[in-house]
């Protein structure tokens, strides 16, 4: 599903523009639209915020102007009281002259002078004041029920208005302000508070749209008062002022910029409206809120204080003001933001693409460096540090070689050989990562690894344990594919000690490697080991014997430059079920699987398919008779063992006539106690294939193979001489070469002799299986007694060849001028071959005669 989706996105309907590109454009357009909308909303909110700030600033200025006018009125009231204290008997002219010089903003407020008149003095005062003003004067009262003015009725005292500034309606002169109960409460409150008091009648507020505020300030004769009633009796005058609310609000908003673009409401703390616009007719603020007229308008809410009265202030913006205050800035900013965002995203995508490309190159470079060099070294190189060779005294070195790989590679295609190596080395790389082992290099079919070469790994015992565990896993997992299917096994050598590690780098191809005597010893452990086993030095044995099992007896081997060394074979870990002990016991009883004298034996298990197909490698060999279909061995003789009489699950290919051992399962221990006189019990289903017809053919094939091996050996030795031999040691080298050739020819003669003996044994076995098998053993003993020299050579054939090759390499040094000596050595080798072949034929004839005579004796 994921691959299909990626494929669809990669498909291009327009050249150079895949579907994914158009999808990206759509996403970009959507994202850009969202950014534009967000920018528009953001700057619209910012504009509204600016309008709100302007509203608050204007509202505060209006409130300030109203409060300043109220303060002027209060100061005028106090000034009028000061006039009384200076001249208690001032008349109207004095009143007008004084207020004209002191009162400000007289058009927004009125001042009243009120005097207390007792009922007994009413008539006398009216006559006297009429003469003073030269007009009729009477005391009137206000009827709240009829909302009318009439002559005041008799009562204990009156508070008529005597003077008013500026002149207003003459009907107000003589009006008793104490004619209503609510006004009486206001006067008492002002006397009690001893400060100016605002008179607001709720009934009047609800009946009128806009009202003016009356402020009263009493003048008390006595200073000590015991009760409010007594204070009312002692009060002589009242200085009062009328605050014209509508005129003051209009005057205050005119002084403010755009003040007329606001809608103002003034109300008491209970919500009764004191002031509103002329085109409105609300009684309370609740009605304003419920009307919904100002729901979408900006609002500012505050309060102001006039004398002792606190009023609530609501100011709303008008639609015209908001429209005039808004600009095209939000739209312009959103467009610019969209353009910038598109450019930024385009630039970011391009930069990201370049960074991804650079990061990909760097990752590939780092991965390549990490594959070539250890992590610690690659980190130093990345940080620009110089990589100097380091010495480690606690390293452990591992060598592995695939036994039989040369034969395998000679009969398979290069592609198959490479694929087999890749599969094997990939498995080993995974095991290295699992155990924390550092892979150093591969040389052909050899594998080298180390651990403990860096300073942080300074525990040699721990490093040895890691390497031994790694080696056991290698022998546990890898041989299952190689041995059972391909006829291949591995030899492993391990040694621990000091090494020097570093990077060898010229101008190209840096290479990390380790050097030292420890590396050489580990290589010797591998080369002198047994196929399918782990060969370790005595030092490794001493470090690991507490947790690992080793062979019961040590081996003594000769190591170049070291002399005789004690070595051991690793059997397994004590805490693990996997063990190499059974395979090791088999290798001690039987010759190596890869010895050319050893019969080729392997089992086909049901869980493993046959041959190269088990490793998913194509087999290009079409001739099925050329070799075994399950391995790389080219042999023709077959012994088939079929327990179920239907399918062959056991194959035996051999060069000799000896039957296979009773058990070839790698998990069955084969030692001397399990060998019987009869290799196959009477109840076993083993069928013998008659090979008497193929004896002569096998002899010819064997001779051709031996001659081919001789030629190859001579060529290799000549190449080694040409490369390594020095001029001073040329004569000695030629002698050694002749001796080696003679030894090899003798080995071949011995092999021919053994082949003839085996052929005779097969003829005898055809007459009587069991008895002839015993006689064959006795006859072999007789031959060994009669021909001791041949027996010794036969037992040490393979070992002598290896020792001769080692000696021929260790004694030679570099030389460049030995062509003539090489030709002489080759002629000597050819002569020796002819002589030895003649001796070979004579020995064969003698052996045949002895076999016939022995048969007659039996």
UniProtKB/Swiss-Prot annotation:
The keyword Magnesium applies. The keyword tRNA-binding does not apply. It is found in: Membrane. Residues 767-778, 788-797, 834-849 have a biased composition (Low complexity). The chain crosses the membrane at residues 19-41. Insensitive to guanine nucleotides. It is a single-pass type II membrane protein. Has a large extracellular domain which may be involved in the recognition of an extracellular signal present during germination, leading to activation or inhibition of cAMP synthesis by the cytoplasmic domain. This is Adenylate cyclase, germination specific.
């Amino acid at each position: 599903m994921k691959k299909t989706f990626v494929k669809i996105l990669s498909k291009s309907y327009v050249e150079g523009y895949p579907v994914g590109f158009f999808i990206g454009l759509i996403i970009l357009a959507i994202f850009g639209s969202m950014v534009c909308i967000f920018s528009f909303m953001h700057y619209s909110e910012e504009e509204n915020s600016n309008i709100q700030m302007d509203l608050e600033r204007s509202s505060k200025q209006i409130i300030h102007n109203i409060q300043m006018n109220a303060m002027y009125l209060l100061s005028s009231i106090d000034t009028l009281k000061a006039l009384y204290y200076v001249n208690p008997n001032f008349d109207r002219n004095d009143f007008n002259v004084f207020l004209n010089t002191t009162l400000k903003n007289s058009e927004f407020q009125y001042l009243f002078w009120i005097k207390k008149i007792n009922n007994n003095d009413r008539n006398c005062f009216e006559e006297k004041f009429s003469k003073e003003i030269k007009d009729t004067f009477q005391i009137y009262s206000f009827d709240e029920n009829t909302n009318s003015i009439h002559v005041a009725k008799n009562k204990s005292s009156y508070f008529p208005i005597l003077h008013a500034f500026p002149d207003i309606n003459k009907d107000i002169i003589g009006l008793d302000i104490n004619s209503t109960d609510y006004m009486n409460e206001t006067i008492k409150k002002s006397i009690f508070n001893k400060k100016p008091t605002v008179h607001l009648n709720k009934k009047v507020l609800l009946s009128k749209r806009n009202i003016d505020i009356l402020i009263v300030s009493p003048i008390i004769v006595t200073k000590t008062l015991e009760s409010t009633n007594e204070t009312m009796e002692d009060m002589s005058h009242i200085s009062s002022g009328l605050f014209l609310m509508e005129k003051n609000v209009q005057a205050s908003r005119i002084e403010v910029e755009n003040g007329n673009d606001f809608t103002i409401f003034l109300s008491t703390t209970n919500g009764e409206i004191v002031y509103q616009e002329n085109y409105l007719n609300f009684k309370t603020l609740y009605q304003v809120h419920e009307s919904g007229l100002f729901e979408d308008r900006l609002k500012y809410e505050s309060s102001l204080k006039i004398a002792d009265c606190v009023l609530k202030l609501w100011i709303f913006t008008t639609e015209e003001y908001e429209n005039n205050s808004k600009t095209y800035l939000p739209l312009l900013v959103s467009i610019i933001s969209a353009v910038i965002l598109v450019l930024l995203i385009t630039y970011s995508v391009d930069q990201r693409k370049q960074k991804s490309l650079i990061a990909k190159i760097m990752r590939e470079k780092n991965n390549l460096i990490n594959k070539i060099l250890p992590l610690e070294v690659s980190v130093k190189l990345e940080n620009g540090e110089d990589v100097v060779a380091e010495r480690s005294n606690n390293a452990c070195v591992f060598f592995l070689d695939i036994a039989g790989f040369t034969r395998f590679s000679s009969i398979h295609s290069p592609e198959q050989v490479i694929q087999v190596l890749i599969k094997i080395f990939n498995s080993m790389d995974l095991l290295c990562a699992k155990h924390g082992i550092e892979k150093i290099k591969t040389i052909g079919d050899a594998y080298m690894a180390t651990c403990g070469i860096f300073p942080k790994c300074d525990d040699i015992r721990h490093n040895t344990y890691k390497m031994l565990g790694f080696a056991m896993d290698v022998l546990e997992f890898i041989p299952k594919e190689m041995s059972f299917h391909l006829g291949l096994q591995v030899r492993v050598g391990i040694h621990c000690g000091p090494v020097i590690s570093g990077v060898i780098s010229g101008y190209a191809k840096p290479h990390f490697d380790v050097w030292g005597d420890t590396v050489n010893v580990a290589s010797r452990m591998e080369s002198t080991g047994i196929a399918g086993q782990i060969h370790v030095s005595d030092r490794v044995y001493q470090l690991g014997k507490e947790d690992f099992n080793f062979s019961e007896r040590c081996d003594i081997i000769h190591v170049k430059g070291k002399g005789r060394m004690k070595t051991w074979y690793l059997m397994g870990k004590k805490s693990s079920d996997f063990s190499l002990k059974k395979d090791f016991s088999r290798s001690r009883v039987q010759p190596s699987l890869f010895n050319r004298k050893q019969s080729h034996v392997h089992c086909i298990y049901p869980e493993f398919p046959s041959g190269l197909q088990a490793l998913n490698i194509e087999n290009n060999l079409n001739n099925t008779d050329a070799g075994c279909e399950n391995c790389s061995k080219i042999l023709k003789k077959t012994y088939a063992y079929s327990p179920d009489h239907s399918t062959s699950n056991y194959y035996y290919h051999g060069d000799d006539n000896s039957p296979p051992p009773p058990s070839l399962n790698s998990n069955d221990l084969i030692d001397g106690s399990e060998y019987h006189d009869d290799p196959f019990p009477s109840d076993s289903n083993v069928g013998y294939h008659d090979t008497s017809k193929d004896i002569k053919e096998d002899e010819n094939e064997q001779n051709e193979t031996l001659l081919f091996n001789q030629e190859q050996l001579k060529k290799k030795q000549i190449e080694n001489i040409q490369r390594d031999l020095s001029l001073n040691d040329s004569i000695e080298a030629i002698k050694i070469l002749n001796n080696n050739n003679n030894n090899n020819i003798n080995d071949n003669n011995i092999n021919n002799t053994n082949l003839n003996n085996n052929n005779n044994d097969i003829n005898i076995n055809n007459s009587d299986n069991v008895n002839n098998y015993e006689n064959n053993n006795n006859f072999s003993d007789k031959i060994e007694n009669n021909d001791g020299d041949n027996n010794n050579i036969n037992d040490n054939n393979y070992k002598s060849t290896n020792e001769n090759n080692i000696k021929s390499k260790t004694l030679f040094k570099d030389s460049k001028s030995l062509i003539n000596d090489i030709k002489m050595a080759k002629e000597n080798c050819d002569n020796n071959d002819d002589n030895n072949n003649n001796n070979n034929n004579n020995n064969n004839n003698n052996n045949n005669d002895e076999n016939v005579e022995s048969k007659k004796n039996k």
